[in-house]
Amino acid sequence: MKRLVIYFHYDPAGCIDTACRIAVQAVQKYGRVVFVTNGTLAPADRVWVRQSGAGRIERENVGFDVGAYREALLTLGREKLAEYEEIVLMNYTLAGPVCSLAAMFTAMDARPELDFWGLTRHYAMQSRRFGGAVPEHLQSHFIAVRPRLFNSDDFWNYWKEIALPASYEQSIIRHETRFTPYFAARGYAWDTYVQTDDLKPVFVNPIMACPRELLANRGCPFFKRRSLFTPYADELRRTDGLAARELCDYVTAYTDFPLELLLVSLLKTQPLSALAQNLHWCYPVGAPTGETPDLNELGLRLLHYEQPAADPVTDWYNRQAAANADTLLAEAAALFEKNPMLGVLSPSLPLWQGCTAARRAAWMREKDALAQEVSVPVGSDPPPAPNCGWVLVRESAFPDGIPACTSQRDAWKLALTAQKNGAYAAAFEPLTGSAARADILNEYETAAAQPAAVAKQLGRLVKHRLQK
């Protein structure tokens, strides 16, 4: 089949990371690729596109994927596109493939009754964020269209008349959730390669909610980058919160996809806290063995810094955590061998709620200045480490030398510097801490479900606001 793939890309620095290159090279086996980027490519990356044999369009960063697809289609033109048997609109938000694409294209080539098809679908739902009633639709990260559709006036009118989005939400409303029902209503037949109708009562967005299931059992060759950094509170409203960790464990164990290289790329563009929450960078360790590791031989260095002033209870728990960490030094050091990208490690924050409140308040005071100093993205949540005045670092994560670390601010800068260098920060805790964390969560969930607790919390919030 003569196929054209229009591949949309965006990177604020104009770089094409390994995951994008793998995807482009994979689809090139099945068609000609036109690489469309919203921005200006770095010189070396522009050379890579040329050497790959792909076409290239560099454009102003307007209109998100919608603008990129529209410009590519209108630039190539109706007459040129009529030479193809299938046109694929694909974007960089997919990572992979984790397996050969032959099965997917062979299966869909055997379905000539379809006028357009996609990799996955999103089921109908209600969403204020996305304009109310969201219909069932193909997800725009991969949509293939065939001649009866792309040679029609319907197709070209759609793209000529579409209003370019100015936000992610507008992109979903104006294109992703509209494309499928728009053409289905005009008599064009569609379906997905990955079949998930049995999951419809469970998840509206299976590729995000259960990516491991789709890869392991349903032949899906791609997963979403966003799985690794999506807002974790949103995930907990839809799932058990384990999707990203299970996905990464599967990809690492059962595929050849270089997940570590994707993580290096994401560390440059996503807050460390978002990645840490989704990937659960808090490691349980067993009882201390009493061994004393040779940190110099392991390329590690133990640093201590002064904790911010706090109330007596918070201060006591922080000091206890640091003292306990000293007894677990061998177990902590072993985590670096197991996790090659680990650069900064500390004990997890004590479960005492005052510790959490104090750390968050300090982070909110420092985060914007730290982001500017280190030039990495930060979120409203602090990194998972360092905590409690105790931090173990991998020397190779700091090729320019380990910065001085005498305060909590310095410690956060240490974690962000490691992030900039392609390493992550994590926490560790004894098994008793992990068990207690589960019990505390259960207690909070039970209490939060009580109407009296909700009313009491609202009263506290109102009182707090009035006192300000």
Model-derived features: where do they sit?
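ER/Golgi luminal nucleotide-sugar-dependent glycosyltransferases, focusing on the catalytic module
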Residues: M1-K468
